[in-house]
Amino acid sequence: MPIDYSKWKDIEVSDDEDDTHPNIDTPSLFRWRHQARLERMAEKKMEQEKIDKEKGTTSKKMEELEKKLAAADVTDKSDIQKQIDEVKAQEEAWRKKEAELEEKERLEPWNVDTIGHEAFSTSRINKITEKKPQAPKTDEEDTHAMSTFFETHESLLEKMAVLKNGAKSTELFLAEHPHMASEYTANWLTIEALNAAIDFNEEKMKTMAEQCIIIQYLLELSKSLNAVATNTTVQKQFFKKFEAAEPVYMKHYQDEVKAFEDRLRTRAQTKRDAAMEEAEAEEKAERMKSAPGGIDPQEVFEQLPEEMRKCFEAHDIEALKGVAQKMDEEVFKYHFDRCIASGLWVPGKADDDDDDEEAAPAEEEPTTSS
């Protein structure tokens, strides 16, 4: 398909291409011509703005008249219709003027002021400091660095732990202490929020959980920008976006906070259960350590037949003798031997003539596990 060059044939690329008389001051002439052209362009712009304004006014007036016509009585409709016809005529007149202006502009040769136009416009801000690559730390180095951070900034961390009002209070806090926007801060808040959950301190846990999520969001933004979170420009940009966030994003944020709180509660329950099991295991080990036969006295006591258990609870030796006479000998002997091995029964000096089950000298007594 051949290219049509006709629209470029009359372009006024430069005024200095015109021939002028030798006695005429060429630079001054060019300046005058250019000034006159700019004035004509300004007049056309004002005319276009006037047309746009009048068109808007007539359109608005037309809408109002149409509403009146729909709600008017039969007697008023003819008057309103006349007004509508007048407005339509005005509207048509402005359309014709606009068409004439467009045609005039189309036929006018291009010049140095109209040959180009702004395709797009951008704004630039100071470049955010890029995050410098760092050598990865070993687990030991990272743990030491985190411990040092906790000790150095203990007072600031404790202040951050009680911040209310969500992101607004975080923004004010970081404005004074931008260096606290750190992964270690998020770690400290997580640890302390978990401790609060273990202690059933819901309010404290929720406060720190929200602060932790805010810091993590800030860290994610800085990572996406390949910048450091301690950069004040990054922080301002983050909180500006946070404040202007749409409801759907705020709901996502709130859901994230609640989910984190639930994870903390679940983890706290697991920690409590584990601590209880550990304490019970230590107590059991201590009891077994003091038992003559290395058997847990509490476990032995809980496994005793009910009638024997009652005798030990009441420290009633006579009743225990009665149980020994009624119970199957092998069964009684099995449990009685376990009582001796666990320390529930402390044997004394028995009479040689009495049976083992019936021996109950002054030195021997049944004991119960607490």
Curated annotation (Swiss-Prot):
One of its GO terms (molecular function) is heat shock protein binding. InterPro entries: Cdc37, Cdc37_C, Cdc37_Hsp90-bd, Cdc37_Hsp90-bd_sf, Cdc37_N_dom. One of its GO terms (biological process) is protein stabilization. One of its GO terms (cellular component) is cytoplasm. The keyword Ion transport does not apply. Keywords: Chaperone, Cytoplasm, Phosphoprotein. Co-chaperone that binds to numerous kinases and promotes their interaction with the Hsp90 complex, resulting in stabilization and promotion of their activity. Inhibits daf-21/Hsp90 ATPase activity. This is Probable Hsp90 co-chaperone cdc37. The gene is cdc-37.
